[in-house]
Amino acid sequence: MSTVPLGRRAVLLGAPVAGLAVACQSGSADSRDRALTRDEERSLATLRTVDASLPLFAMTHYGTYDPLQPIAMASSPQRFACSLFLAGGGPRGPLFGRNFDWRPSPALLLTTRPSREATSLSLVDISYLGIDQDAGKRLMDDPELRRRLLKAAAIPFDGVNQHGLAIGMAAVDTAQPPKVPGARVVGSGRIQRLVLDQARNVDEAVAVFRRYTVRFEPGEVPLHYLLADARGKSAAIEFVGGEMRVLPGAGDWHDMVNFVLSTADESEKRSDTRYRTIAERLRRTNGRLDPAGAMDLLSKVAQHHTRWSAVYELRHGEMTLALARDYRRIHRFKLDA
């Protein structure tokens, strides 16, 4: 990682948190007292502070984890927004850009190295693990709080894996997923972990979605998803009337914000300032942006509550990251598979 100068309504598990994750706040006596495995100890030993101002932490999770473990969440009436895009051309190959817009809370840059699935790099809002701003200040010195990070692998907000497959989500007004006969039911955020673990490209990611029944719990905010891969292929995944709809990208680019693409007409798309701004830039450049240009585009559609702006280089496993709209300080990370 290096830092160099450069001149909600979003949620992960379905709904923004009004409070903390109750299950992670209290925990059971067994989970608190259970001895850590060797992989868990090794994982927590990698924890470090990247940027104390947000704060942003980083950790590598080694070994196995349960992507379907339950994490209790509380809903919120607040409405926030996100912006995502694929820029398929340019000197560094396909780029996946993403603004995550939500209230201030600590974040974790998580590298997962499971024993059998793909290695991945993702960002996690750890308030969903019961670590709010105050708890974040104590995290490095509090063993119980650090232990909660072992659940973070289950809830990526956006990320890329070693094959160059990226995924991110944004909230919409409505989503009615199909009930797949005989399929395992998964949460609206956990499906992203399954995609990062199991898919190498967009086609395989779509197949992962089809293997599970995605469920939005009562009170949760519905979502749609953007997929992109190292070949420059992309697709949006939406749920309309009990049907999963797959919307391929328009040539070398794709654009997604907070309305249902598959039911929106052209006037609705153009009336959304963020969508229009991204689409006009990508159309004008034929999707050819370098990482600095992609970050500049994210800055143009950032809002006052933008938590992070991330640009993933899908052929190189690299990420550039700006926190809280500070585009003069850019953090750089690389996923070494």
Language model segments and positions:
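Short, flexible active-site loop motifs that bind/organize anionic cofactors or intermediates
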Residues: M1-S2, V195
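N-terminal secretory signal peptides and thylakoid transit peptides that target proteins
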Residues: S2-A18
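Basic side chains
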Residues: R8-R9, R98, R274
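N-terminal mature-domain region immediately after signal-peptide cleavage
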Residues: L13, V22-R193, D197-Q198, V214-R215, ...
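Generic helix-packing signal
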Residues: G19-L20, F209
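A surface/extracellular/periplasmic glyco- and lipid-processing/surface-interacting theme
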Residues: I167, T174-L298, Q303-T306
